[in-house]
Amino acid sequence: MGKDGGPEYLTVFNGETGAAMQTVDFDPPRSILTSSKWGDSYANRSERYLAAVAYLDGVHPSVVMTRGYYTYVYAAAYTWDGTDLKEQWLSTNTPTEENGGTGCTVKYADGTSKNNTNKTLYAQGAHSVSVADVDNDGYDEIIFGSAVLDHDGTVLTYDGRGHGDAEHVSDFDNDGKQEIFMAHEAGKHNDKIIPYAVDIKRYNSDIMLQAAQGDIGRGIMDNVDDDYALSSGNLSLFWSVAADGIYNQAGEKVGNIPNTNGSNMENFAVYWDGDLGRELLDGNKLVKYSVTSGTERIYYNSKNSALPGSINNGTKSNACLTADLFGDWREEIVLRYGDGVRIYFSTIPTDYRLTTLMHDSQYRCAIAWQNVGYNQSPHTSYYIGSAALAKDSGGNTLNYLAPSTSFTKVTYPDTSLFTPRPTVKATTAPVTVTANADTYLVDSTTAHGSDEELKINQAQNVYTSSSPGLKDIKGLGLIRFDLSKYAGKKLTSATLK
């Protein structure tokens, strides 16, 4: 769009034919504010769009489009039923002092509205967005930099630390809760101005805040040395371009920052070599890191060279995509090459049996938002690492994740993207499992994904609980809940309605 503006649209295209199926006006239009109110006088910041797919009702996918993140922020959610693209709500975010403390106003499709007091997305956005169920209510939230947008368009939480370049969201410490790591350019904490910082938090509480001396263009957090994680109890580590070391979740330095040919490798993490720690990807360089010895090796052929192909986004050095495309829980790397693309995949065997990562809806949603803004690594909703492996009755470690460390995972025959998933309701009467039955028994032996896992209609697997609080679990895996509180307890039968 030129500097003089013009119409903007949101269009649904047929994925098989490329045909436009429906087009609506983009909401809101750029003209809703003057250029200076977007954060500059030449219109660039009015065009800061972010986008995501999220299961806002726990069952159906919604498209969430946002506009602006340096100052005013608008977020709109849409549903698509195969024919009509309909707006669910529009969230308008302003300075809290502008409207008597009301920082967020949400207007719904039915004409109703809702306000937030002293909470706003205003000036809190990052160059990326994440999707996760951070409050374990069964509905996806949108992690929007230093604030979290709830499934209904209101602001769930807001810390006021402002804009940043990088964010990562997962259960980094295997406690069944989502942690949020973010690198900030500017903001404040307890009324103290902090120009630059990294922090780790849950949606409603701080874990660690580390001040920095300059702009933090990149930062990352993950389990990158699984042997160290298991032996030390530091299950995930973080580092950034603004610090001189690698740190545990408490902010304590535990090792030297990775360095490979001048790169600190704080860009991307991928599962590649078959152990449960992630390798580091910066541009087309793929390396393995050790806390004790530093970078151990560069992967790709006998010359330890970079993967052939071109990278994207200049200094951000992104692949086109990283994802578990082929289902072996390791991740493929997609790079531009000439006038096409190359997909690189690991040929290294693994001893571990993990569910395909794309069956975790948080990970699947991450693949959808990965290319938005500054690309960020996708993460599962659960911790992956040796510290989370199951044990048998004799205390021997097994080669799959313990049920207490994983959320609901389900496979189902996806005959139609637009068909609502069945509702799962708990029942107290045990039943006999038969092929193609509508009722089935779920017990502790099925929760970890073993060979005894029961199949419904030859394709659907589900884990549920006898807890009254979980009597209505929707979405067959699109809603996730923590099983750790039920560890050691017998789970009961359930009925598909």
What residue ranges belong to the model's regions?
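Short beta-strand/loop motifs in extracellular/secreted proteins, especially
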Residues: V73, G477, K489-T492
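A short beta-strand element within beta-rich, extracytoplasmic domains
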Residues: F481, K490-K497
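Exposed beta-strand and adjacent loop surfaces of beta-rich binding modules
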Residues: P7, P430, S493
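Acidic glycine-/aspartate-rich tracts in secreted/extracellular proteins
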Residues: K485-A487
